[in-house]
Amino acid sequence: MADYWKSQPKKFCDYCKCWIADNRPSVEFHERGKNHKENVAKRISEIKQKSLDKAKEEEKASKEFAAMEAAALKAYQEDLKRLGLESEILEPSITPVTSTIPPTSTSNQQKEKKEKKKRKKDPSKGRWVEGITSEGYHYYYDLISGASQWEKPEGFQGDLKKTAVKTVWVEGLSEDGFTYYYNTETGESRWEKPDDFIPHTSDLPSSKVNENSLGTLDESKSSDSHSDSDGEQEAEEGGVSTETEKPKIKFKEKNKNSDGGSDPETQKEKSIQKQNSLGSNEEKSKTLKKSNPYGEWQEIKQEVESHEEVDLELPSTENEYVSTSEADGGGEPKVVFKEKTVTSLGVMADGVAPVFKKRRTENGKSRNLRQRGDDQ
């Protein structure tokens, strides 16, 4: 059987971050050491400091939440005061509770029972609040449960002042310049002025201007029909001046009685008067017309283009360029190469042939040949 070595078990110390032998004498010797005891005390102090910091943070957060709740409750009570309602939620008050005073708890319970009975008797008093959506619909909100509904709750009594001043009908202006009336509760719209319509003080000047413009439009429409009588014209002209005092909407009405047997002279005078009134009414309607954010319609007039030749005073370019045929006619110039002969290779005596010197070799040996060494 083969022999083998077995290593001793080791143990890791978390405080000192080192390995020691996993036996009783080694562990006891390490724990009795000064370094190990200092590390243990240091770890305990760190844990204590962390727990204190965590407790401080929790206390700070609880104080912040309490301040937020108090501010929210204060704002809620201010809203209730602004709406003219009584707050049913009491402010939170911190009072020390002791076991030596048992009758106070019973008295508080009796008061709470009485309040609950009162609330059951008058469930809608001071509980429901009426609101209006952005589209003009009315809804009712429960302050206690937070529920909302469209139907009016039983026993609900809103502010009498608000309901008296509240206007159901709203005056508007159509795209054609006619005024109409819109009911915010039922969604109904009509051209005739309702009986219970209450105009706003800020809307009076605009309504007068709209009525003046409507009166001028009605006059222009009535002038197109030749069957209108003189009495109607005077009534319409007088209506333009009196409309500013009393708001009314006039629509086009046809006269049943036709003046077929009138004289031609009176008809001419009537036509002249109608043309004059039309011109003045058109000018008034232009000035009193409601401004359109996209601009007004304009008639496009086509301009006749004249094809007359216009002298642009450009520089003349008659002799500036040469035609391509003239440029190609000359052709490319021919290149002539000259020949040169060498008469002599340099300064030398007459009658002596040129001598070419050979390259000297080192000790009579050629460099290109591989020479055998001296050892061989």
Swiss-Prot record:
<dbReference type="GO" id="GO:0071011">
    <property type="term" value="C:precatalytic spliceosome"/>
</dbReference>
<feature type="region of interest" description="Disordered">
    <location>
        <begin position="189"/>
        <end position="335"/>
    </location>
</feature>
<feature type="compositionally biased region" description="Basic and acidic residues">
    <location>
        <begin position="298"/>
        <end position="309"/>
    </location>
</feature>
<dbReference type="InterPro" id="IPR003604">
    <property type="entry name" value="Matrin/U1-like-C_Znf_C2H2"/>
</dbReference>
<dbReference type="InterPro" id="IPR036236">
    <property type="entry name" value="Znf_C2H2_sf"/>
</dbReference>
<feature type="compositionally biased region" description="Polar residues">
    <location>
        <begin position="203"/>
        <end position="215"/>
    </location>
</feature>
<dbReference type="InterPro" id="IPR000690">
    <property type="entry name" value="Matrin/U1-C_Znf_C2H2"/>
</dbReference>
<dbReference type="GO" id="GO:0070064">
    <property type="term" value="F:proline-rich region binding"/>
</dbReference>
<keyword id="KW-0991">Intellectual disability</keyword>
<feature type="compositionally biased region" description="Basic and acidic residues">
    <location>
        <begin position="218"/>
        <end position="229"/>
    </location>
</feature>
<dbReference type="InterPro" id="IPR013085">
    <property type="entry name" value="U1-CZ_Znf_C2H2"/>
</dbReference>
<keyword id="KW-0507">mRNA processing</keyword>
<keyword id="KW-0225">Disease variant</keyword>
<feature type="domain" description="WW 2">
    <location>
        <begin position="163"/>
        <end position="196"/>
    </location>
</feature>
<dbReference type="GO" id="GO:0016607">
    <property type="term" value="C:nuclear speck"/>
</dbReference>
<feature type="region of interest" description="Disordered">
    <location>
        <begin position="94"/>
        <end position="128"/>
    </location>
</feature>
<feature type="modified residue" description="Phosphoserine">
    <location>
        <position position="227"/>
    </location>
</feature>
<comment type="function">
    <text>Involved in pre-mRNA splicing as a component of the spliceosome. May play a role in cross-intron bridging of U1 and U2 snRNPs in the mammalian A complex.</text>
</comment>
<feature type="region of interest" description="Interaction with SNRNP200">
    <location>
        <begin position="357"/>
        <end position="375"/>
    </location>
</feature>
<feature type="region of interest" description="Disordered">
    <location>
        <begin position="356"/>
        <end position="376"/>
    </location>
</feature>
<dbReference type="InterPro" id="IPR036020">
    <property type="entry name" value="WW_dom_sf"/>
</dbReference>
<dbReference type="GO" id="GO:0008270">
    <property type="term" value="F:zinc ion binding"/>
</dbReference>
<dbReference type="GO" id="GO:0003723">
    <property type="term" value="F:RNA binding"/>
</dbReference>
<keyword id="KW-0677">Repeat</keyword>
<feature type="zinc finger region" description="Matrin-type">
    <location>
        <begin position="11"/>
        <end position="42"/>
    </location>
</feature>
<feature type="compositionally biased region" description="Basic and acidic residues">
    <location>
        <begin position="361"/>
        <end position="376"/>
    </location>
</feature>
<keyword id="KW-0597">Phosphoprotein</keyword>
<feature type="compositionally biased region" description="Basic and acidic residues">
    <location>
        <begin position="243"/>
        <end position="257"/>
    </location>
</feature>
<keyword id="KW-0539">Nucleus</keyword>
<dbReference type="GO" id="GO:0045292">
    <property type="term" value="P:mRNA cis splicing, via spliceosome"/>
</dbReference>
<dbReference type="Pfam" id="PF06220">
    <property type="entry name" value="zf-U1"/>
</dbReference>
<keyword id="KW-0508">mRNA splicing</keyword>
<dbReference type="Pfam" id="PF00397">
    <property type="entry name" value="WW"/>
</dbReference>
<dbReference type="GO" id="GO:0005634">
    <property type="term" value="C:nucleus"/>
</dbReference>
<dbReference type="GO" id="GO:0071005">
    <property type="term" value="C:U2-type precatalytic spliceosome"/>
</dbReference>
<keyword id="KW-0862">Zinc</keyword>
<comment type="subunit">
    <text>Component of the spliceosome B complex. Associated with U2 snRNPs. Binds splicing factors SNRPB, SNRPC and SF1. Interacts via the WW domains with the Pro-rich domains of KHDRBS1/SAM68. Interacts via the WW domains with the Pro-rich domains of WBP11. Interacts with SNRNP200.</text>
</comment>
<feature type="compositionally biased region" description="Polar residues">
    <location>
        <begin position="316"/>
        <end position="326"/>
    </location>
</feature>
<dbReference type="GO" id="GO:0000398">
    <property type="term" value="P:mRNA splicing, via spliceosome"/>
</dbReference>
<protein>
    <recommendedName>
        <fullName>WW domain-binding protein 4</fullName>
    </recommendedName>
</protein>
<feature type="compositionally biased region" description="Basic and acidic residues">
    <location>
        <begin position="189"/>
        <end position="198"/>
    </location>
</feature>
<dbReference type="GO" id="GO:0008380">
    <property type="term" value="P:RNA splicing"/>
</dbReference>
